């Protein structure tokens, strides 16, 4: 399964903790992530992570295209509900819209991510 990881700056540590806790499950899948999140997860866990461009360089658009072409099976987006960045919020909403359009499961917080990863 192809799983994509995205995390706002204030949620990157939570994404690392999630990936560490579920490393044995995630290691059986192909992981990809936006640039900074992917590097941090790979460095902390040793899991191989393919990197998309950074958010500001079009990383979300790359992910959206992969979702549209059915190349991504699941997306974890750990968002900061207190972030005040309208552009970032629009990118997240577009990615969620793509997931909904193409029937790709998406988790936007730790509880929903655990439900998806545990099946």
Where are these regions (language model features)?
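Ser/Thr/Gly-rich flexible loops in soluble cytosolic domains mediating phosphotransfer, phosphorylation
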Residues: 92-119
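Histidine-anchored nucleotide/phosphate-binding helix
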Residues: 13-24
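Short internal beta-strands
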Residues: 28-37
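Short hydrophobic/aromatic-enriched beta-strand-loop microsegments
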Residues: 30, 47-57
């Amino acid at each position: 399964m192809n799983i994509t990881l995205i995390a706002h700056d204030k949620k990157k540590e939570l994404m690392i903790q999630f990936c560490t806790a579920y490393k044995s499950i995630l290691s059986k899948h192909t992981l990809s992530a936006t640039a900074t999140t992917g590097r941090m997860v790979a460095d902390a866990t040793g899991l191989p992570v393919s990197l998309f461009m950074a958010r500001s360089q079009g990383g979300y658009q790359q992910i959206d295209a992969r979702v549209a072409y059915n190349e991504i099976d699941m997306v974890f987006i750990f968002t900061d509900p207190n972030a005040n960045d309208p552009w970032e919020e629009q990118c997240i909403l577009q990615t969620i819209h793509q997931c909904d359009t193409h029937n790709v499961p998406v988790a936007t917080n730790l509880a929903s991510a655990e439900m998806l990863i545990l099946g």
